């Protein structure tokens, strides 16, 4: 599947809209690169945790951590016992719990160390990363590969951008991985809704009613 995004002439030269279109196109094209079997195993493990009333603990560093927080929030709306590792109010990880580790590189030391500890106490570790052969990917029970910018793709992008007259990447650093993971996890939430028979009204009732 290869799609093109057409911008109105008035927006072609605007950096905000050009960047938005680049990110959207990357996310759409990444769909074919994400393995269905990996996704089904990940969703199935989440369903097991829900039905067995176990805990889901999500972790990530930096912007990946923010993506993880958004995912944990939606899991809470579905009725999961979900937490974000690193927050002040987090219960201990037990056997049968699921730890979801988000790291584009799969090498972030604090994430790898926490995943190793989770494995030692008997938890299942699911990694979302661009590099399945990374330290995080190798130690995880479940790996979902989500595309992101790599060293080789940077070189390919460089020559393509030279031809187009674009000399700087429009989506810097880990932006493409983080945004793609965010959309992917929203898809996971909808899959869980259908599997568990949960509708939007239920989620609305689970939403916080005392907010700052």
UniProtKB/Swiss-Prot annotation:
<dbReference type="Pfam" id="PF01380">
    <property type="entry name" value="SIS"/>
</dbReference>
<dbReference type="InterPro" id="IPR001347">
    <property type="entry name" value="SIS_dom"/>
</dbReference>
<feature type="domain" description="SIS">
    <location>
        <begin position="46"/>
        <end position="198"/>
    </location>
</feature>
<dbReference type="GO" id="GO:0016853">
    <property type="term" value="F:isomerase activity"/>
</dbReference>
<protein>
    <recommendedName>
        <fullName>Uncharacterized protein APE_1940.1</fullName>
    </recommendedName>
</protein>
<comment type="similarity">
    <text>Belongs to the SIS family. PHI subfamily.</text>
</comment>
<dbReference type="InterPro" id="IPR046348">
    <property type="entry name" value="SIS_dom_sf"/>
</dbReference>
<dbReference type="GO" id="GO:1901135">
    <property type="term" value="P:carbohydrate derivative metabolic process"/>
</dbReference>
<dbReference type="InterPro" id="IPR017552">
    <property type="entry name" value="PHI/rmpB"/>
</dbReference>
<dbReference type="GO" id="GO:0097367">
    <property type="term" value="F:carbohydrate derivative binding"/>
</dbReference>
């Amino acid at each position: 599947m290869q799609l093109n995004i057409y911008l109105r002439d008035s927006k072609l030269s605007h950096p905000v809209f050009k960047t938005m279109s680049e990110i959207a196109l990357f996310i759409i094209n990444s769909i074919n690169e994400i393995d269905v079997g990996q996704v089904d195993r990940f969703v199935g493990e989440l369903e097991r945790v829900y039905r067995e009333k176990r805990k889901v603990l999500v972790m990530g560093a930096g912007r990946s951590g923010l993506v993880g927080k958004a995912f944990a929030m939606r899991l809470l709306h579905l009725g999961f016992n979900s937490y974000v590792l690193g927050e002040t109010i987090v219960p201990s990880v037990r056997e049968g719990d699921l730890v979801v580790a988000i790291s584009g590189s799969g090498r972030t030391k604090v994430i790898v160390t926490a995943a190793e500890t989770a494995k030692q106490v008997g938890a299942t570790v699911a990694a979302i990363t661009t590099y399945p052969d990374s330290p995080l990917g190798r130690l995880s029970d479940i790996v979902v590969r989500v595309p992101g910018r790599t060293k080789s793709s940077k070189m390919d992008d460089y020559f393509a951008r030279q031809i187009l007259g674009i000399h700087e990447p429009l989506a810097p650093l880990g932006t493409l991985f983080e945004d793609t993971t965010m959309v992917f996890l929203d898809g996971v939430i909808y899959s869980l809704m259908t599997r568990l028979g949960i509708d939007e009204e239920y989620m609305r009732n689970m939403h916080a009613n005392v907010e700052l």
